[in-house]
Amino acid sequence: MKTKPLPTAPMAWAESAVETTTSPRELAGHAPLRRVLRPPIARRDGPVLLGDRAPRRTASTMWLLGIDPAESSPGTRATRDDTEQAVDKILRGARRAGGLTVPGAPRYHLTRQVTLTDLCQPNAEPAGALLLALRHPTDLPHLARHRAPPGRQTERLAEAWGQLLEASALGSGRAESGCARAGLVSFNFLVAACAAAYDARDAAEAVRAHITTNYGGTRAGARLDRFSECLRAMVHTHVFPHEVMRFFGGLVSWVTQDELASVTAVCSGPQEATHTGHPGRPRSAVTIPACAFVDLDAELCLGGPWGAFLYLVFTYRQCRDQELCCVYVVKSQLPPRGLEAALERLFGRLRITNTIHGAEDMTPPPPNRNVDFPLAVPAASSQSPRCSASQVTNPQFVDRLYRWQPDLRGRPTARTCTYAAFAELGVMPDDSPRCLHRTERFGAVGVPVVILEGVVWRAAGWRACA
């Protein structure tokens, strides 16, 4: 049986490959380029080219790389020129796309802000602590006048913030315009301000003791009390804290001077992807106070080898002279569209309380003023204008109908019944997310914390539950 001899002329190994006369050994110092230029089905040493004969170049490859084969003369020199031109185009495209990166390297984004250390003292916080950005305080009294129900004391919020400014840094903590600066709020400081609202009272008091001790003694304690009063005044005037706070990032590094701090945090991507700059703890895992952490899957008896979502949750109690605000970090396998029903089950008592007492101390409407829709009176009168179903879209007939304009003051609304609000913080993509419960020492104070490993930040917007 005769067999055909192998052809001596070189053959094209792949349509999308760029063939060159340069041997792989000459490209030993250019491994990335060799991976780009060598086709996936080529042998390790590539095709052997005999003599000075140029390889065959496919039109599709040259067209995609922007090379005109007609402009190149045949031969080894023309082939090398085409190869150099192709490599140059590939490298320029890689530089425009952000450079050659290591395959599989995590992508993350850092953010930085200079802030006063009144509500966020990075020297006293662990790497990986959660930070929130606060809206400018001068906006809050204006929001209170627009959102507070009739009869609520809108001046209560302005007075509470004024008292907080008196205990802030740099004397009064006011800028040249006479108002406070916008800044950052540490999650631990927020938890300490809401310590009275947590069920785990001992763990919450430990967080408060940590803030009072490591933030500046009695001055920090006064700020905690006055910030807590600000939160209650915000609930009273329906300027809910979740509407003026947003996720900033996980703490990585900081530089402090006097009462100012330049804070760097991971706002997107893996928290553990960047270096903290501390030899003893080069990587930062997310650290949450144990009293403010809720494993929703364990509470609802859910389980399985899946990843989990992380949510930031605010809860409110709207009861006259008993307003409360509380903040949690919730871990759950439920996606955002299914979390509201789970929160309703978990905080159902707050929902009932707000529905019953949320409309208290509001100015009611005058008696007997369009309380009910007067359907019986127009229906009984033959002189009342009517409109058939086919004429509903015609303004000529619709405008003649009776207009009912009830007075909704003092009636329950979605805002008076709001008991919680949540926003997605990120995910824990591991099949078995690790949540380590331990006691961390902050100076002389031991605080029960939960350390979350493998958190990937991807913050989303707020959703209110009513």
From Swiss-Prot:
* An example molecular function term from Gene Ontology annotations: DNA binding
GO cellular component assignments: host cell nucleus; viral capsid
A Gene Ontology biological process in which this protein takes part is: viral capsid assembly
Q: Protein transport as a keyword? A: no
Where is the segment annotated Disordered?
A: 1-29
A Pfam family (short name) is Herpes_VP19C
InterPro entries referenced in this protein's UniProt entry, alphabetically: Herpes_1 (IPR004999)
- Keyword presence, rRNA-binding: no
Q: Which UniProt keywords apply?
A: Capsid protein, Host nucleus, Virion
Q: Family per UniProt? A: Belongs to the herpesviridae TRX1 protein family.
What does the UniProt record say this protein does?
A: Structural component of the T=16 icosahedral capsid. The capsid is composed of pentamers and hexamers of major capsid protein/MCP, which are linked together by heterotrimers called triplexes. These triplexes are formed by a single molecule of triplex protein 1/TRX1 and two copies of triplex protein 2/TRX2. Additionally, TRX1 is required for efficient transport of TRX2 to the nucleus, which is the site of capsid assembly.
| Protein name, as recorded | Triplex capsid protein 1
| Native organism | Human herpesvirus 2 (strain HG52) (HHV-2)
